[in-house]
């Protein structure tokens, strides 16, 4: 077996064993309703509204430089006064490639940490301001906790956590260490999403009563690949039945509804369809004897959930990554004066002559977000999901450098990730409502809550 095959096999084994362990955690969570019904008491004060300490220059480490981590690295290298000081990955060649990208950008070679699955702990002990985490999901919480306990802020890819216990671990650690844990939800920074948020805050749609969010993306090829995310991302479909990836759709809609800025998620119900598409794809594309043919998937092709908020509003939340279909996050809202729907983006404003949708371009001059006005050309040039990745990274680095309150905090990270275990519990109990924990400990309506991307 050559070195690459050995490496893939080792990582595949790590992914399988990690997911197996996750099944135990998940089962434990479903049987522990106290995690959802009461906020654990703590002597630590909230991180709501707490600004970063101004750094002027950001010293940064990245854990995980595969496809996603490498893309984040390119964005960060293009931002002024950001120094990439450390790189960690299980694959030495990926560390070396990332180090070369840093030196090619004119910076000193960052320290490399390729020595096994615990080497990230050495990275988090360096003199850094923030640690980016772009790894398989089972490592998000251990790595973020290590960063915060060693005095660094954490920026973690989506979803931030897999279980309610992990959600609370992030919240508790952030509050105890006074370090932020930011979820890297790039979809909150899309040009359309930020423009619609401005329309909402301007009252264009009146009082918002309903939103729709989803992740509808045909990932069959990625899930069954023999490299990259295919080494681990398919395995939750064997062990879990619910919404495995809620944040891309939910994050922007949560901002439209001012979640943790005047409202919060109260409870949700969830049902899953039968599983059929991933099994059919594997059967059609992999020969007899391939190990994938022996896998049994339990995650329904489509998971549909309804979230009710404390103020009585509703959110439709869906997940489907295995059916052939066009990409969509739904991304829509309804209010007393109008509505917005995406894919394609369009607006409806109530009025005597209004009978059909209007193209959103007619609203761009008034509502384009200042970040997109000033940085949009560079963001689009950088690429990364139409530029939203660069805007996200630029904004986070700017908040760090200037000492602003982060747009997205640990309470958002926990609440947006919580639909995974809650949907799983609801599906397992025939759609029984599941309460959301109040991760903010009753601070969700606090005046300390900063508006999203409005500080300048």
State each model region's role.
Residues 301:
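Short, small/polar residue-rich loop motifs at catalytic or cofactor-binding pockets
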Residues 160-162:
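Short, acidic/turn-prone active-site loops that include or flank metal/cofactor-
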Residues 16-21, 25, 71, 323-456:
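C-terminal helical cap and adjacent loop that interface with cofactors, partners, or active-site loops
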Residues 64, 176-182, 187-297, 396, ...:
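Predominantly a Rossmann-like dinucleotide-binding segment in NAD(P)-dependent oxidoreductases
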Residues 305-311, 335:
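Active-site beta-strand termini and strand-to-loop segments that position acidic
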Residues 2-152, 165-180:
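N-terminal glycine-/serine-/threonine-rich beta1-alpha1-beta2 phosphate-ribose binding loop
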């Amino acid at each position: 077996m050559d070195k690459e095959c050995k490496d893939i096999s080792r990582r595949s084994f790590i992914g399988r064993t990690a997911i197996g362990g996750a099944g135990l955690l998940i089962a434990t969570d479903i049987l522990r309703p106290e995690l959802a019904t009461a906020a654990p008491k703590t002597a630590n004060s909230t991180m709501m509204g707490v600004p970063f300490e101004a750094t002027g220059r950001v010293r940064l480490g990245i854990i995980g430089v595969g496809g996603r981590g490498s893309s984040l690295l390119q964005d960060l290298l293009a931002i002024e006064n950001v120094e990439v000081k450390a790189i960690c990955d299980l694959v030495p060649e990926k560390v070396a490639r990332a180090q070369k990208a840093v030196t090619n950008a004119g910076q000193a070679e960052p320290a490399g940490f390729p020595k096994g699955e615990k080497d990230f702990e050495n990275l988090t002990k360096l003199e850094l301001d923030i640690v980016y985490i772009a790894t398989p999901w089972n490592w998000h919480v251990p790595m973020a906790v290590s960063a915060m306990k060693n005095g660094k802020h954490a920026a973690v890819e989506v979803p931030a956590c897999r279980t309610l216990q992990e959600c609370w671990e992030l919240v508790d650690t952030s509050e105890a260490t006074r370090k932020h844990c930011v979820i890297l939800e790039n979809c909150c920074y899309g040009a359309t999403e930020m423009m619609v948020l401005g329309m909402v805050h301007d009252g264009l749609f009146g009082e918002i009563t309903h939103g729709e969010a989803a992740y509808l993306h045909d990932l069959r090829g990625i899930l069954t690949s023999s490299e990259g995310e295919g080494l681990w991302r398919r395995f939750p479909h064997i062990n879990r039945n619910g919404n495995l990836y809620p944040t891309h759709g939910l994050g922007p809609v949560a901002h439209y509804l001012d979640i943790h800025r005047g409202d919060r998620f109260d409870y949700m119900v969830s049902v899953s369809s039968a599983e059929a598409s991933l099994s059919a794809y594997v059967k059609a594309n992999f020969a007899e004897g391939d190990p994938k043919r022996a896998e049994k998937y339990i995650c329904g092709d489509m998971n549909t959930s309804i979230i009710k908020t404390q103020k009585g509003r509703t959110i439709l939340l869906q997940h489907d990554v295995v059916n052939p279909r066009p990409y969509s996050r739904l991304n829509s809202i309804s209010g007393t004066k109008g509505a917005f729907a995406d894919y394609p983006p369009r607006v409806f404003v109530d009025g005597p002559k209004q009978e059909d949708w209007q193209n959103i371009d007619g609203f761009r001059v008034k509502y384009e977000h200042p970040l997109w006005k000033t940085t949009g050309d560079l963001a689009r040039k950088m690429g990364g999901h139409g530029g939203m990745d660069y805007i996200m990274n630029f904004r986070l680095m700017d908040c760090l450098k200037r000492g602003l309150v982060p747009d997205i905090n640990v309470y958002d990270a926990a609440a947006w990730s919580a639909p995974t275990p809650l949907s799983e519990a609801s599906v397992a109990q025939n759609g029984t409502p599941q309460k959301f924990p109040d991760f903010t400990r009753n601070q969700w309506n606090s005046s300390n809550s900063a508006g999203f991307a409005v500080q300048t």
